[in-house]
């Protein structure tokens, strides 16, 4: 919801050179479409990159143009490069100053660079970084080794996974060399719950690599054919251990637990054809279990229960092929989810007529609106942050991040009420309740040291 009307909008790019915005009723938003003059293949990232309190839309196009739009469709700024921007940009606070930087990759003939810029078009210090290999997918960004500094992970057509430090240097232990090119971006997740992120990426030889933060290989899964679209993360069977969901040219949708080394019972499931999309997860029917949504390239949309059995009314045949990842939201605020799917023929929105659940899950491409490709708690930071006095209920970003040795959260109440502040991990499990009390109206600051309930 970028225009503040309490209803979600749908934003997407197309091969006709336009970037579109529609409301929940299918009406084109004022200021849209926005023409960039070339194919728009990257999923837009959304975040407040200029610190004005409103979210901006960031996307790339095949003419080397990175566009930053205001929420009314007007141009905020443009950054031009030589080459193509096909992958989704990622938004992340690289320097800990409270502002989101924009990280994106390029494809220039057989070469490519990794860019990091500020919202005003200025290059982040020591960027761009010339990788010397083209990249057709975007970067993943997070703090891999819990050292308080961001890491940028990119996968290339040169059969490599690179990790770039925030100072522009290549992280020790990288690049990791595989045996074929990568057409999927990396996903970052703490699989073994040791406080450090693993890197997950699949190549065109069917190999799904799971790497530790230092570049050593932790696990390997072989599908026998190209892995495409992307890798999502979920705890489908609620055993406290994460599964990796992915598909590709083997026509199967996999749900693999790398810690146990096996696929879940009932998986993989047959999609009937190649898949180019990243699976997404959501509790569609409010039963407490997650459903998995995926599509094949011939336009068949599938929904499966957590155990691999088909969801009612699916599979569903759509007009046109599907080459992009669906997204799920309650667009019309009626208490059930809608599934939005872009096809080669247009945009399709499917209304799922069941009460929706509220489980934390991977509901869109790259896991979040910032397109960081990461599952975990991310607190925006600003050491000099001063909370405003809003006219409505307000929760501030946590600061500082990483907490040193703690982080603070400001909550503003417009009237006296009960405050309950709870911390959850990426699996949706309660970590700690740091406050549960009645409070007067006004500003309240709560501190968390990173401890759990124990």
Segments and roles (model prediction):
Residues 321, 441-445:
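Short, solvent-exposed loop/turn segments in extracellular or other extracytoplasmic domains
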Residues 4, 72, 117-120, 355-358, ...:
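Short linear sequence motifs
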Residues 381-424, 433-437, 445-451:
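Glycine-centered coil/turn sites that cap beta-strands in beta-rich domains
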Residues 454:
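Conserved glycine-rich acetyl-CoA-binding loop
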Residues 111, 359, 418-420, 431:
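Internal amphipathic alpha-helical segments of the cytochrome P450 catalytic fold
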Residues 1-380:
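Extracytoplasmic/lumenal domain signature
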């Amino acid at each position: 919801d970028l225009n503040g009307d309490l209803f979600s909008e749908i934003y997407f790019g197309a091969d006709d050179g336009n970037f579109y915005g529609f409301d929940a009723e299918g009406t084109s938003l004022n200021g849209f479409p926005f023409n960039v003059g070339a194919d728009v293949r990257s999923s837009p990232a959304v975040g407040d990159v200029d610190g004005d309190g409103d979210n901006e839309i960031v996307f790339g196009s095949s003419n080397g143009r990175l566009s930053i739009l205001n929420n009314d469709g007007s141009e905020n700024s443009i950054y031009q490069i030589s080459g193509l921007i096909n992958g989704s940009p990622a938004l992340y606070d690289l320097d800990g100053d409270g502002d989101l930087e924009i990280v994106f990759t390029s494809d220039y003939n057989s070469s490519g660079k990794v860019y990091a810029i500020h919202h005003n078009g200025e290059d982040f210090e020591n960027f761009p970084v010339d990788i010397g290999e083209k990249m057709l997918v975007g970067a993943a960004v997070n703090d891999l080794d819990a050292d308080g500094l961001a890491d940028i992970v990119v996968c290339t057509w040169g059969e490599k996974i690179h990790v770039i430090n925030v100072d522009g240097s290549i992280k020790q232990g990288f690049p990791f060399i595989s045996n074929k090119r990568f057409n999927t971006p990396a996903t970052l997740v703490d699989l073994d719950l040791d406080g450090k992120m693993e890197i997950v990426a699949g190549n065109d030889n069917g190999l799904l690599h799971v790497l530790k933060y230092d570049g050593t290989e932790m696990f390997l899964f072989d599908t026998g054919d190209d892995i495409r679209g992307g890798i999502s993360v979920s705890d489908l069977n609620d055993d406290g251990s994460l599964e990796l969901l992915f598909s590709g040219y083997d026509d199967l949708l996999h749900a693999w637990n790398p810690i146990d080394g096996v696929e879940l019972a009932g998986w993989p499931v047959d999609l009937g054809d190649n898949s180019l999309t990243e699976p997404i997860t959501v509790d569609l029917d409010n039963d407490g279990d997650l459903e998995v949504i995926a599509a094949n390239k011939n336009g068949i949309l599938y929904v499966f229960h957590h155990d691999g059995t088909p969801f009612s009314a699916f599979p569903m045949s759509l007009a046109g092929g599907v080459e992009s990842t669906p997204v799920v939201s309650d667009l019309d605020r009626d208490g059930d989810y809608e599934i939005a799917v872009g096809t080669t023929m247009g945009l399709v929105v499917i209304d799922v007529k069941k009460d929706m659940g509220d489980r934390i899950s991977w509901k869109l491409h790259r896991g979040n609106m910032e397109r960081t490709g990461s599952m975990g708690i991310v607190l925006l930071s600003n050491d000099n942050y001063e909370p405003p006095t809003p006219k409505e209920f307000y929760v501030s970003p946590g600061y500082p991040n990483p907490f040193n040795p703690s982080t603070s959260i400001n909550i503003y109440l417009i009237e006296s009420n009960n405050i309950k502040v709870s911390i959850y991990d990426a699996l949706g499990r309660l970590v700690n309740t740091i406050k549960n009390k009645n409070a007067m109206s006004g500003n309240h600051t709560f501190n968390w040291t990173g401890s759990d309930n124990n």
